[in-house]
Amino acid sequence: MSPRQPLVLALLVLGCCSAAPRRRQPTLVVFPGELRTRLTDRQLAEEYLFRYGYTRVASMHGDSQSLRLPLLLLQKHLSLPETGELDNATLEAMRAPRCGVPDVGKFQTFEGDLKWHHHNITYWIQNYSEDLPRDVIDDAFARAFALWSAVTPLTFTRVYSRDADIVIQFGVAEHGDGYPFDGKDGLLAHAFPPGPGIQGDAHFDDEELWSLGKGVVVPTYFGNADGAPCHFPFTFEGRSYTACTTDGRSDGMAWCSTTADYDTDRRFGFCPSERLYTQDGNADGKPCEFPFIFQGRTYSACTTDGRSDGHRWCATTASYDKDKLYGFCPTRADSTVVGGNSAGELCVFPFVFLGKEYSSCTSEGRRDGRLWCATTSNFDSDKKWGFCPDKGYSLFLVAAHEFGHALGLDHSSVPERLMYPMYRYLEGSPLHEDDVRGIQHLYGPNPNPQPPATTTPEPQPTAPPTACPTWPATVRPSEHPTTSPTGAPSAGPTGPPTASPSAAPTASLDPAEDVCNVNVFDAIAEIGNKLHVFKDGRYWRFSEGSGRRPQGPFLIADTWPALPAKLDSAFEEPLTKKLFFFSGRQVWVYTGASVLGPRRLDKLGLGPEVPHVTGALPRAGGKVLLFGAQRFWRFDVKTQTVDSRSGAPVDQMFPGVPLNTHDVFQYREKAYFCQDRFFWRVSTRNEVNLVDQVGYVSFDILHCPED
């Protein structure tokens, strides 16, 4: 054996034993509540081609050749390589965020004109997203309209009623028009072509993160930046921050820089916090007092206890039980999670995940690299989480595109055009010369052309201060809600559960402000365990044990801005807390501050023989009895349709009540049938409905004085 042979063997052994160690595979987990698509590429393609008008059937059986023609059509429309194959470029386009209006064909809800036949177009912002301050949303929509008015003779006027030509709405999932949104990303918004009713309206998916295209917009308070919004990311002591922070402070107050580099510019402000101010409520915007006592229990943070609508609130004195003063806690878009199973909650830092502590958003555990956080201090035990905010979608750009549809424009196949169906962020005016030619073909040029509105430039720092961020010792927040204080009910700060968290009593609309002077009410409903009585655009609230005097009047338009002044009936569905309002042949559905509708009664399965719904009685299992035309139907809240076979005369189930009742409602688990000023109360014993009381609505229910 050669003397070198042992050395060779030794080297081989050494080389074998010193091979590079394997890299540790990342731990991937299935996050609870996350919707995971199981669609194959073909299923995705079939669904996409059907949704956007390229095929007329949702599922196409056969081999890949059956997709060839619709794929060629799609590729031509989207300016993709025309291969007729389901290639990577086509699949990538199908997964891109986009407008929900079909590329081929139109929404078929109503017959609509191709254009408006008047030039002064009105619009109404029916509700708002919580992602942006309201003034920022107002400005984004105004600038989007200004793009089109700059190149046409059209003018756009904001109004505050449903009579507007274009009604703007934020909604989620199925929101009342038959064209549901699909959750975060994907379908961003849609709009209808000009015409009456829902035609011309623009709807935005409120499960998206709406921004100005560069990340969340967080206003600041105090500091030295005059209320300028946070700049994310920003640098502080050499470290980059993508959210408000408490670093550098001993008082725990969250702050941010309003320029890209605090170390250089020294411009800052404090982020929205309940320690700075509260919203609405009855405490005139005063900050929270921690700890505070509610129903004998001590709270050191905002809570949703005592509320059915999920709004976070706090007391503004040490004892809510004693002082009854409260406000609603502001939210911060930079730390409010999107999706997951805790949408709308705040990130909690630090949090524990797989035994390790995290002080910022992380992509650990995820295959797609998306940043997420826990909304409690321990994900391992609580499994509560959501995605951290990303750059979001520019509300201005998406609105400008949707308003193009509302004016009569179709999608374009030119990727550079504003009317191209896919979303892309860009600076400056998004109007392409092809967009201008299209809109001027419909309306002509602007006889007095002016440059379109541009984004207000970010304020530039002046002389940098010499001190680090300090808490203003004496001043209070300079801005707080303008609504008048409202007395909190004795059971806790509930307020109307559907609109902005509180509704303030309004100035009287006529001398008959006293509810006891109303002879016959338009509608009566139990909402949030309180009886609500409606009349001529106003309503009063009444609860047994709250001083036995109704609160109000309140304006319907302030609490539920989408509703008409005259209502026929209303009810709250016990399981989902959805509110249904009926007026004439239309219905509106409120979920929190979001509204679906108006929808026609035909959509529920009620034909023209039912001129209006006169009342409703919720039943178990998501069922409701709807009344109208002296008959009743069983209504399924989930499908929002009536069982057409269930129509039966009222006296068949409720013997002894008048047939020509104008309102039917449920209160304290009993049914009430109203005729003129009187009611017939029905209780159920041994599955038999019996009238057990006849009385006056004013005297026997509202406890008005008999004088």
Curated annotation (Swiss-Prot):
One of its GO terms (biological process) is proteolysis. Pfam families: fn2, Hemopexin, Peptidase_M10, PT. It comes from the Eukaryota. It comes from Oryctolagus cuniculus. The keyword Ribonucleoprotein does not apply. Belongs to the peptidase M10A family. The conserved cysteine present in the cysteine-switch motif binds the catalytic zinc ion, thus inhibiting the enzyme. The dissociation of the cysteine from the zinc ion upon the activation-peptide release activates the enzyme. Disulfide bonds join 230-256, 244-271, 288-314, 302-329, 347-373, 361-388, 516-704. Its cofactor is Zn(2+); Ca(2+). Matrix metalloproteinase that plays an essential role in local proteolysis of the extracellular matrix and in leukocyte migration. Could play a role in bone osteoclastic resorption. Cleaves KiSS1 at a Gly-|-Leu bond. Cleaves NINJ1 to generate the Secreted ninjurin-1 form. Cleaves type IV and type V collagen into large C-terminal three quarter fragments and shorter N-terminal one quarter fragments. Degrades fibronectin but not laminin or Pz-peptide. SUPFAM superfamilies: Hemopexin-like domain, Kringle-like, Metalloproteases ('zincins'), catalytic domain, PGBD-like. Residues 437-508 are annotated as: Disordered. Ca(2+) 2 binds at residues 165, 197, 199, 201. This is Matrix metalloproteinase-9. It catalyses: Cleavage of gelatin types I and V and collagen types IV and V. Its main location: secreted. Ca(2+) 1 binds at residues 131, 206, 208. Binds 2 Zn(2+) ions per subunit. Residues 1-19 form the signal peptide. It is found in: Secreted, Extracellular space, Extracellular matrix.
